[in-house]
Amino acid sequence: MSSLRIYNDNDFSQPLVFTEDGAEISRQLNEAGIRFERWSTRELDEGATPDSILAAYQEEVEKLKAENGFTTADVVSLTPAHPQKDEFRKKFLDEHRHSEDEVRFFVRGQGLFYLHLEDKVYVVLCRKNDLISVPNGTKHWFDMGPEPEFTCVRLFTNPEGWVAQFTGDEIASKAPRFEQLIEEA
């Protein structure tokens, strides 16, 4: 089940808000300028290829492209067996921002987006069928956990794909990690 925790950015001991209600997650995030929605499930084979995944969600992807000017979409998958999983996790764990929206639709699996908005940190557990769109310039980081298991559709306006501008803020090192929050759930 997806969830949202909201913390003061100087105190991660207890969330100010915790909810697993999809409508409440959407409401809280939309009020903060973050798009969050649930898409209908598509039946996909276990070994679905990136092309078959994009074809299954073509209507939704094309709608997002038209609404937001995205030029490309791709599919990224990570499993616990990936030889570079630790490097990838470390790369995404530092607070950064982008010059374009970061859009992810979870086809399967899960991951945590941490959104540093003013004096709060919104921690969003995204799972299968969740779409999150983090506006350009938003300070954030992502934790896939020590044993990542996810497949996501990504959309870009920049043909170079994922390009981060790291903030240098150490806040991400103070926040609870994936394994701690998933264990609590």
From Swiss-Prot:
Q: Which UniProt keywords apply?
A: Amino-acid biosynthesis, Dioxygenase, Iron, Metal-binding, Methionine biosynthesis, Nickel, Oxidoreductase
Binding of Ni(2+) occurs at H96, H98, E102, H140
Report the cofactors.
Fe(2+); Ni(2+)
GO MF annotation terms: acireductone dioxygenase (Ni2+-requiring) activity; acireductone dioxygenase [iron(II)-requiring] activity; iron ion binding; nickel cation binding
One matching Pfam family is ARD
Q: Name one GO biological process term.
A: L-methionine salvage from S-adenosylmethionine
The residues listed in the UniProt record as binding Fe(2+), with positions renumbered to this chain, are H96, H98, E102, H140
Xref: CDD domains: cupin_ARD
Query: Does the keyword Amino-acid biosynthesis feature in the UniProt annotation?
Result: yes
Reactions catalysed, semicolon-separated, are: 1,2-dihydroxy-5-(methylsulfanyl)pent-1-en-3-one + O2 = 3-(methylsulfanyl)propanoate + CO + formate + 2 H(+); 1,2-dihydroxy-5-(methylsulfanyl)pent-1-en-3-one + O2 = 4-methylsulfanyl-2-oxobutanoate + formate + 2 H(+)
**Which residue positions hold the site described Important to generate the dianion?**
R104
As recorded in UniProt, its EC number(s) are 1.13.11.54, 1.13.11.53
Cofactor binding comment, as recorded: Binds 1 Fe(2+) cation per monomer. Binds 1 nickel ion per monomer.
Q: What class of enzyme is it?
A: oxidoreductase
Site (May play a role in transmitting local conformational changes) at: D101
Q: Which domain of life is it from?
A: Bacteria
Pathway entry? Amino-acid biosynthesis; L-methionine biosynthesis via salvage pathway; L-methionine from S-methyl-5-thio-alpha-D-ribose 1-phosphate: step 5/6
Site annotation May play a role in metal incorporation in vivo: residues = E95
Summarize the protein's role. Catalyzes 2 different reactions between oxygen and the acireductone 1,2-dihydroxy-3-keto-5-methylthiopentene (DHK-MTPene) depending upon the metal bound in the active site. Fe-containing acireductone dioxygenase (Fe-ARD) produces formate and 2-keto-4-methylthiobutyrate (KMTB), the alpha-ketoacid precursor of methionine in the methionine recycle pathway. Ni-containing acireductone dioxygenase (Ni-ARD) produces methylthiopropionate, carbon monoxide and formate, and does not lie on the methionine recycle pathway.
The text of the family note is: Belongs to the acireductone dioxygenase (ARD) family.
Q: How does it assemble?
A: Monomer.
What PANTHER family does the database record attribute to this sequence?
ACIREDUCTONE DIOXYGENASE
Instruction: List the protein's name.
Output: Acireductone dioxygenase
Q: Which organism is it from?
A: Hahella chejuensis (strain KCTC 2396)
Q: What is the lineage of its organism?
A: Bacteria, Pseudomonadati, Pseudomonadota, Gammaproteobacteria, Oceanospirillales
